[in-house]
């Protein structure tokens, strides 16, 4: 009890409370206190705005927003195997879904409603399940569905995303040649959609000429954005961290070598909002909602869309969206920017891009009120002076004649009850001419960037070698150094001409001349290259011209990884993440076509120290192996429906796949192989663990009883001490080949 032999009263009380209180497993079974889905101010305010045409519709609206949100997901459309995965979903997965839901709700299978294919999503690639996220996560009959959603999301086969959140990228209408800016991109589900659209024509472009620049003001959320977007392994993505309302002008290099201010073809402004359209997904908003949120956000929303309009190319398209129902955050912001643009911006109707979507037109009349909705204002003159800093003139609707010219009815208002979804607002703007308030001075911007790149001047010293203090200050206002928040990022070091590592890579993999070594980069300056990344030419140009102008979080896709092995002279292996890119430029010498049975066997081999022997492969594959030297290679499998490419390793007498666990399961699913080896049932695992813990507790009690009744001469248990088996080590041996840098050569 310590040196002073005094017992700590507070520690003892805490220990007693922990021992006598409910166990963690007991608490997990207890639900959170149910949130009361009601807010008098919310109901009064939206009744005032007449967002529903009739009392009957208002009743439907209230019933809908008080209900939980169904789960939705979409299939990644640009991948070659998308149709095959969709077929598996519609047959195997949904058959299992019907069986599990019938068991969960104790219904007959024929009474279970099948998942709904969203009619407005392109190519029928999105589905809505009549289950909530909590249903899927906490119900044992649905564990296979839960496993599928987790694995396929990680592998990039699908994306879990709220249905209405899919609308803005669709109406933005991105093409492979577009320069796209996502101004408020985190957490990244819409960014992933934009990347998919950019890669929609792989047969036309090895690497899309366009790019997606995804930005967010929150440094931590930027890493969430990277995690979401990296699943698609695009070399055409750049992630930045900046306040989008003051996003800097970026410099780009024109074909003639001159510099220019970058203008974007497509811009997505999914601005911060009060989020009251997400009440079904986030019921805690019922407790926090108040009208002051919309008033506070209106200004920042306007500044973001105004900055977006400045950076938009003439003829370009900007989509403004929120997950709010409030006209103060929606129509009021749009009428203000359109009025300030003085004819340079025009609202366009994009309803034809989402055929089958049910929505209402934008509002042309609305009212403002106090926080408690006890005073209603129709004109700014009615607002008390004490509220003038909160309620501004631009928030009120324009006179009817001016409003008619703006065309706010072209906006899309999606209400929850229309198609069992969340609430959302979308508007599409096109730029007809340059804005009067645009600033396009490229000369000063280039000078600032070049100055930042110059090395620091040598310090001046006196006769004794001591540094001389600088006392003179340049004349005029001084430019403050921008403070960067968050983590300090590693540098982006691009390959120079005749880089020795690139020459070795090019020779070993027979890389095409069209793959520019200038676009390969590492994240270290002095150390030996470990990971080599690839980015597209436009992304490289953006990084080099603007690395001192904006904080860059991430770019490039991992393409080559150092993996030295005594049986091969080449020190770099291919990375599965970059295979989508490198495959388009590689020669035939490091490729091998394999049969289905071979690929299934290799993917099922999860022990990196025991790779499949070439003698176990089919004869056709064995013959092809004879022409392939030791080292990294591409395994190609051709199916009637799709072609699969995976990274492999040819050992001296073995051939193995080099794929992470989730992608392994994804490929095996496409091949129709048995997945039981990888299947996990967390409920069964919990029961086994609980039973083991109970047995251990019984054993301890028996041992204690024996000790108390014995004469004190009992020997130690043969299972104690260093001879005990560590079951966690045994469990960890089921890891995947990517968990280690060991390369088997047997």
From Swiss-Prot:
Belongs to the class I-like SAM-binding methyltransferase superfamily. RsmB/NOP family. TRM4 subfamily. One of its GO terms (biological process) is short-term memory. Its main location: nucleus. Ubiquitously expressed during embryonic development. Some enrichment is observed in the proventriculus area of the foregut and in the hindgut. It catalyses: cytidine(34) in tRNA precursor + S-adenosyl-L-methionine = 5-methylcytidine(34) in tRNA precursor + S-adenosyl-L-homocysteine + H(+). Residues 18-30, 463-472 have a biased composition (Basic and acidic residues). RNA methyltransferase that methylates tRNAs. Methylates cytosine to 5-methylcytosine (m5C) at position 34 of intron-containing tRNA(Leu)(CAA) precursors. Required for short-term memory. PROSITE patterns: NOL1_NOP2_SUN, SAM_MT_RSMB_NOP. S-adenosyl-L-methionine binds at residues 184-190, 216, 243, 270. Residues 704-714 have a biased composition (Acidic residues). GO terms for cellular component: cytoplasm; mitochondrion; nucleolus; nucleus. It is found in: Nucleus, Nucleolus. InterPro entries: MeTrfase_RsmB-F_NOP2_cat, MeTrfase_RsmB-F_NOP2_dom, RCMT, RCMT_NCL1, RsmB/NOL1/NOP2-like_CS, SAM-dependent_MTases_sf. It comes from the Eukaryota. It is an enzyme of class 2 (transferase). Its EC number is 2.1.1.203. The active site is at residue 323. This is tRNA (cytosine(34)-C(5))-methyltransferase. Keywords: Methyltransferase, Nucleus, Phosphoprotein, RNA-binding, S-adenosyl-L-methionine, Transferase, tRNA processing, tRNA-binding. Residues 731-746 have a biased composition (Polar residues). It holds the Pfam family Pre-PUA_NSUN2. One of its GO terms (molecular function) is RNA binding. Residues 1-30, 454-475, 701-746 are annotated as: Disordered.
């Amino acid at each position: 009890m310590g040196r002073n032999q005094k017992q700590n009263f507070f520690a003892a009380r805490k220990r007693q409370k922990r021992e006598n209180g409910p166990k963690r497993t007991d608490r997990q079974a207890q639900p959170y206190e149910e949130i009361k889905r009601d807010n008098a101010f919310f109901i009064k305010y939206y009744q005032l705005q007449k967002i529903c045409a009739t009392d009957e519709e208002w009743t439907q609206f209230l019933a809908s927003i008080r209900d939980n949100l169904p789960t939705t997901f979409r299939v990644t459309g640009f991948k070659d195997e998308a149709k095959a995965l969709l077929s598996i979903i519609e047959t195997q997965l949904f058959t299992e879904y019907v069986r599990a839901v019938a068991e969960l709700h104790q219904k007959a299978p024929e009474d279970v409603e099948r998942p709904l294919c969203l009619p407005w999503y392109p190519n029928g690639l999105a589905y809505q399940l009549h289950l909530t996220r909590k249903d899927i996560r906490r119900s044992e009959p649905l564990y296979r569905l839960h496993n599928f959603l987790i694995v396929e999301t990680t592998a990039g086969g699908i994306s879990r995303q709220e249905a209405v959140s899919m609308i803005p990228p669709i109406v933005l209408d991105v093409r492979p040649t577009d320069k796209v800016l996502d101004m408020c991109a985190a957490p990244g589900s819409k960014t992933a959609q934009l990347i998919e659209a950019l890669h929609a024509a792989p047969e036309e472009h090895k690497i899309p000429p366009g790019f997606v620049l995804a930005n967010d003001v929150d440094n931590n959320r930027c890493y969430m954005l990277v995690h979401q977007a990296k699943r698609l392994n695009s070399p055409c993505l750049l992630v930045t961290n900046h306040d989008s309302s003051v996003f800097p002008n970026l410099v780009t290099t024109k074909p003639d070598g001159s510099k220019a201010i970058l203008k974007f073809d497509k811009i997505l402004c999914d601005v911060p909002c009060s989020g009251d359209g997400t009440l079904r997904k986030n019921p805690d908003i019922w407790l926090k909602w108040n009208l002051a949120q919309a008033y506070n956000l209106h200004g920042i929303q306007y500044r973001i869309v105004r900055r977006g309009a400045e950076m938009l190319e003439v003829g370009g398209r900007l989509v403004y969206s929120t997950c709010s129902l409030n006209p103060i955050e929606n129509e009021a912001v749009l009428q203000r920017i359109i009025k300030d643009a003085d004819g340079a911006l025009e609202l366009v109707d994009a309803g034809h891009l989402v055929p089958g979507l049910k929505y209402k037109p934008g509002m042309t009349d609305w009212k403002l009120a106090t926080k408690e909705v006890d005073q209603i204002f129709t004109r700014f003159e009615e607002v008390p002076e004490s509220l003038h800093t909160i309620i501004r003139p631009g928030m009120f609707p324009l006179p009817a004649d001016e409003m008619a010219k703006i065309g706010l009815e072209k906006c899309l208002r999606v209400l929850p009850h229309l198609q069992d979804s969340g609430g959302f607002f979308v508007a599409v703007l096109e730029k007809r001419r340059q804005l009067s308030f645009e600033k396009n001075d490229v000369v000063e911007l280039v000078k600032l960037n070049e100055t930042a790149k110059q090395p620091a001047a040598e310090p001046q010293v006196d006769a004794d070698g001591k540094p001389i203090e600088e006392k003179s200050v340049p004349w005029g206002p001084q430019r403050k150094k921008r403070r960067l928040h968050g983590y300090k990022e590693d540098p982006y070091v691009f390959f120079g001409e005749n880089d020795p590592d690139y020459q070795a890579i090019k020779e070993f993999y027979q890389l095409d001349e069209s793959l520019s070594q200038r676009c390969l980069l590492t994240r270290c300056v002095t150390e030996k290259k470990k990971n080599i990344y690839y980015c597209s030419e436009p992304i490289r140009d953006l990084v080099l011209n603007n690395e001192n102008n904006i904080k860059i979080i991430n770019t490039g896709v991992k393409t080559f990884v150092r993996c030295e092995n005594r049986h091969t002279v080449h020190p770099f292996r291919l990375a599965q993440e970059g295979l989508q890119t490198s495959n388009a430029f590689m020669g035939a010498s490091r490729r091998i076509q394999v049969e289905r049975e071979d690929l299934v066997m290799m993917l099922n081999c999860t022990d990196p120290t025991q790779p499949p022997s070439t003698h176990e492969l089919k004869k056709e594959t064995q013959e092809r192996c004879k022409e392939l030297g030791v080292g990294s290679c591409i395994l190609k499998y051709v199916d009637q429906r799709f072609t699969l490419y995976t990274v492999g390793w040819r050992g001296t007498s073995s051939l193995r796949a080099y794929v992470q666990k989730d992608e392994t399961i994804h490929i095996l699913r496409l091949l129709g192989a048995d997945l039981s080896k990888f299947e996990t049932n967390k409920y069964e695992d919990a029961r086994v663990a609980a039973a083991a813990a109970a047995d251990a507790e019984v054993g301890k009690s028996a041992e204690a009883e024996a000790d108390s009744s014995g004469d004190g001469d009992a020997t130690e248990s043969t299972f104690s001490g260093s001879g005990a088996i560590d079951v966690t080590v045994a469990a960890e041996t089921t890891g995947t080949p990517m968990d280690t840098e060991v390369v088997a050569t047997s």
